[in-house]
Amino acid sequence: PSSPHKFCWFNHEPEEYQALLAGHTVTGAAGFGIFSELEFDGGVRLCFNDGVNPRFIRKEEVRPKKYQLLLEFTDGSAIVFTVAMYGSISCHSGDYDNEYYRKSIESISPLTEEFDEGYFKELLASVKPAMSVKAFLATEQRMPGLGNGCLQDILFQAGIHPKRKVSSLSDCEKNVLWAQVKTVLQTMTEQGGRDTEKDLFGNPGGYQTLMSKNTWASGCPACGGEIVKENYLGGAVYYCPSCQKMEEEKR
């Protein structure tokens, strides 16, 4: 790294990555859960989580001065990896023994047919009743790749407050929440990610967020009321107190 980062973790000494990767050819790429992974010949892999920002740099472009890893190719182009808050960049040969890496691979993805209502309700039943809906959705990688950024629109579309206890959800609300997890994540994926994030080439995602740093000052898209922004469980939450009640509406 040109700029050491206190909260960027490597599974080898950073100086060893040169020897581990030099001479290998990129053969593919994969994404699962919170990880993206570059695949090289010889079984070598470079994986990084959602706290790492990779950026493709063309041959004629100037390299940034600060980065945590610079991967240069023989044609003069490169990928620069930077970390804002925290992240991990790991080089391995299929033997990476990391809890979140394993969960990202082994857990059932919300983008698959296997993630049905029955499985979702099993997940709900497996956690403590007093757990909040945000904690259920965004911690422990129960749903690979679903984090704080994605859950904002899921909860808004479901009409559920992020601080609601799991035990307070009715069967109807559980069904709606499952459907919105599936629908919102599928839409985000198809549209190239959220507009609050950038892709490998520096372009923002095509999914227009409803509840995010881009929209919270504009008011609720459903009722026009004020959107609340506050810190909760290690990250900002955005919600409409009118549309997302702390308890189910009685009909």
Features from the language model and the residues they span:
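Acidic, proline/glycine-enriched N-terminal capping motif
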Residues: P1-R102, V237, E247-E248
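Short, amphipathic alpha-helical segments
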Residues: E61-K65, E114, V127, P144
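Noncatalytic, beta-rich nucleic-acid-contacting surfaces in large DNA/RNA-processing enzymes
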Residues: F56, L70, E117-Y119, N175, ...
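Short histidine-centered catalytic/ligand-binding loop motif
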Residues: E60, K103-E113, R164-D171
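A short, charged helix-loop
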Residues: G87-K128
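Basic, nucleic-acid-binding surfaces and adjacent catalytic neighborhoods in DNA/RNA-processing proteins
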Residues: P1-Y17, A30, F35, K121-R251
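Short, mixed-charge, low-aromatic patches
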Residues: T74-F81, H92, I105-E113, S132-E140, ...
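Flexible, active-site-adjacent loop/turn segments at secondary-structure boundaries
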Residues: D50, P54, A84-G87, K103-E106, ...
